[in-house]
Amino acid sequence: MAQEVSEYLSQNPRVAAWVETLRCEGETDKHWRHRREFLLRNAGDLVPATDETADAESGARTRQLQQLVSFSMAWANHVFLGCRYPQKVMDKILSMAEGIKVTDAPIHTTRDELVAKVKKRGISSSNEGVEEPSKKRAVEGKNNSSVERDHGKKSAKTDRSAAQQENSSPSRGSSTKSESGGTSARSSSSGSHQDSATSEGDRSVCSQSSSNSSQVTAGSGKALESEAPHKRGSASFVSSLLKSSMNSHMTQSTDNRQQSGSPKKGALEGSSGSASQSSSEIEVPLLGSSGSAEVELPLLSCKSSSETASSGLTSKSSSEANISSSVSKNSSSSGSSLLTPQSSSTNPSLLTSKSTAQVAASLLATKSGASLGSVSQLAAKSGSQSSTSQLPSKSTSQASESSVKFACRKLTNEDIKQKQPFFNRLYKTVAWKLVAVGGFSPTVNHGELLNAAIEALKATLDVFFVPLKELADLPQNKSSQESIVCELRCKSVYLGTGCGKSKENAKAVASREALKLFLKKKVVVKICKRKYRGSEIEDLVLLDEEARPVNLPPALKHPQELL
């Protein structure tokens, strides 16, 4: 056929000159040879009869010629570059190109053909045949190993760290450091007024004092001043109990506010004083017994006889004593705060969140009667010892404190609507990247391909590693003790889990399982039940449209921490 076209053009030099003007700049000979045949087959009466008519073409003929040239270029792009156009355009150019034989055209595989081929062949779900990632990926994995190791450690220590983080009181105050009598002193420079401290049952209630000598303001509001008179009686008992220890160790000054404590071991961990601009306040956790190890409140442990912890704050204009106690959700944990007295006149006020009986029980919790301690305001008596270390509670309060480390909320369809558009775009990106590498195969670096597709959409692939022996929801055997489990997530949505002898191998397996989802017709985000430390939790999981989630792998981290 090429010979026939060449003979025709040699016999008609005018037509050859005209069609040569339609050649694109930089077009290869192979492309032009076939496109020229396409033009000559469909030119018809567009070929000028004489040179004069070629120079004076009408507007209609010009538009028809431009349309023909466009069709010829679309056909050449489809044949040689694999481009596809709307179905009407494809039908038109293929019908116009009937009879043209292209023997040296490259073979292109479309995404639909690739997916159909993979479905027909079938995909093995076993973990065998997974090749190790390249050395480049291994180096990157080592660079990120420290971060990934932290994820594993934090997952195992969630319950222990939760109790320690919730022990401190919500009151705050800014302080400056000074030295007095060879000991470290801490003075409160300015206190920020606290609006509310009783919003939750498991948090302690904090009290504040005003600059007025006759007014006491609590964290929960001024309405608590009018509590029942029997609470005043309990407060008076507390005042008389603490007054004798206070007189020998607290120094008062109208101009200077000072506080003395142990240099190292007597460091304060309890709640600090929170006051308004012209007043100050001293907070003292309640007295406990050193002989009882299981008392469920911040105990006062004895150190050496030479270590004492005391602090006193005096105000310029007001030095009225204010003793307040805060009782948390557990009836065994409580605290008190004390202001310095003015001219031996004491006006205490006791604030509790439960009942007076609970406060009295916690104040008198000295089973052995060995010693009394004070944490921030009172030093020990001559034979007693005190320090400020706090022990975390070992009762059910630990579970309640760990449960508020992150606010658990129920997943809804709104969460799915927020995540689904991103994964629709990721589906298309992964599909084109699979076409670029020749399709899904064991030789492809699945982790690198998945990470590149996610980074192309300005997102991050989250990777978590945990030793297999730390998962309580999987069977244990001798051969799997050293295996590593890897979980992949993106946008707080679970993608897949893999297990291997090393972190790189586990990540490669997880990436391959995640990529299998994108070989289906559509991916959807669903709310599914998963195991986490023996209990069922809700999680956002990426699945294909027809999949029914059964026995999903256990979660390595709680999903609520990642939302």
Swiss-Prot record:
Residues 249-262 have a biased composition (Polar residues). Residues 147-160 have a biased composition (Basic and acidic residues). The keyword tRNA processing does not apply. Keywords: Acetylation, Isopeptide bond, Nucleus, Phosphoprotein, RNA-binding, Ubl conjugation. PANTHER family: CDKN2A-INTERACTING PROTEIN, NF-KAPPA-B-REPRESSING FACTOR-RELATED. The modification Phosphoserine is found at S124, S234, S371. Its main location: nucleus. Residues 19-126 form the XRN2-binding (XTBD) domain. Residues 445-520 form the DRBM domain. Interacts with CDKN2A/p14ARF, p53/TP53 and MDM2. Interacts with CHEK2 and MAPK3. Interacts with XRN2. This is CDKN2A-interacting protein. One of its GO terms (cellular component) is nucleoplasm. It comes from the Eukaryota. Regulates DNA damage response and cell proliferation in a dose-dependent manner through a number of signaling pathways involved in cell proliferation, apoptosis and senescence. Residues 122-289, 304-351 are annotated as: Disordered. There is a cross-link at K177 (Glycyl lysine isopeptide (Lys-Gly) (interchain with G-Cter in SUMO1)). Belongs to the CARF family. It is found in: Nucleus, Nucleoplasm. The modification Phosphothreonine is found at T340. May be ubiquitinated. One of its GO terms (biological process) is DNA damage response. Residues 168-216, 234-248, 270-280 have a biased composition (Low complexity). One of its GO terms (molecular function) is p53 binding.
